[in-house]
UniProtKB/Swiss-Prot annotation:
One of its GO terms (cellular component) is ER to Golgi transport vesicle membrane. This is Golgi SNAP receptor complex member 2. Part of a unique SNARE complex composed of the Golgi SNAREs GOSR1, STX5 and YKT6. Interacts with BET1. It is found in: Golgi apparatus, cis-Golgi network membrane; Golgi apparatus membrane; Endoplasmic reticulum membrane. Involved in transport of proteins from the cis/medial-Golgi to the trans-Golgi network. A motif (IxM motif) lies at residues 118-120. It is a single-pass type IV membrane protein. Residues 1-190 are cytoplasmic. Keywords: Acetylation, Coiled coil, Endoplasmic reticulum, Golgi apparatus, Membrane, Protein transport, Transmembrane, Transmembrane helix, Transport.
């Protein structure tokens, strides 16, 4: 298990460094970088499935720690996947905005009585304002989606960690009072997470209302 874990852990760090290349890549190479990162992420998910099987076969005294290490890798790669999707969403929105601006600049309007071209400054200004609003909303939605994905992944990790802690507690023979305190803390964490999600949605709604 250890060689595969070290290989996967190294791949996660390599992807983190490659994410910085996305911001500096030109239009011709950005798709190649995205595909390269996505292929590495897919390979890591495949390794994680194998690691989960191997961790369950570890000796009892090392099994819990092995599963926690695998869960941490899964949490890290889920964040990388979310970051990649958000970048792709922003890039596609920017490319669409540029195409629409180019189409508008290449279009001319004429009057019915003559071939006099109508000035387009006001139309361009109005279109630019709309595109800025749309771009701001896209960034906001992408950021909110990233936060919600992070909270969801954290909830899954905490849930798995709680179960493992309870299993360890049972093996060690901890008292019922300690067990109840652990369960109470997990219950409180759940409400904190739900409150954070609701607050995020409320902020997104208010900002969208302000922008429109």
């Amino acid at each position: 298990m250890e060689p595969l874990y070290q290989q996967t852990h190294k791949q996660v760090h390599e992807i983190q460094s490659h994410m910085g290349r996305l911001e500096t890549a030109d239009k011709q190479s950005v798709h190649l970088v995205e595909n390269e990162i996505q292929a590495s992420i897919d390979q890591i998910f495949s390794h994680l499935e194998r690691l989960e099987i191997l961790s369950s076969k570890e000796p009892p005294n090392r099994r819990q720690n092995a599963k926690l290490r695998v869960d941490q890798l899964k949490y890290d790669v889920q964040h990388l996947q979310t970051a990649l999707r958000n970048f792709q969403h922003r890039r596609q929105a920017k490319e669409q905005q540029e195409r629409q601006r180019d189409e508008l600049l290449s279009r001319t309007f004429t009057t019915n009585d003559s071939d006099t071209t109508i000035p387009m400054d006001e139309s361009l200004q109005f279109n630019s304002s709309l595109q800025n609003i749309h771009h701001g909303m896209d960034d906001l939605i992408g950021g909110g989606h990233s936060i919600l994905e992070g909270l969801r992944a954290q909830r899954l990790t905490l849930k798995g960690t709680q179960k493992k802690i309870l299993d360890i507690a049972n093996m060690l023979g901890l008292s019922n009072t300690v067990m109840r305190l652990i369960e109470k803390r997990a219950f409180q964490d759940k409400y904190f997470m739900i409150g954070g999600m609701l607050l995020t949605c409320a902020v997104m709604f208010l900002v969208v209302q302000y922008l429109t």
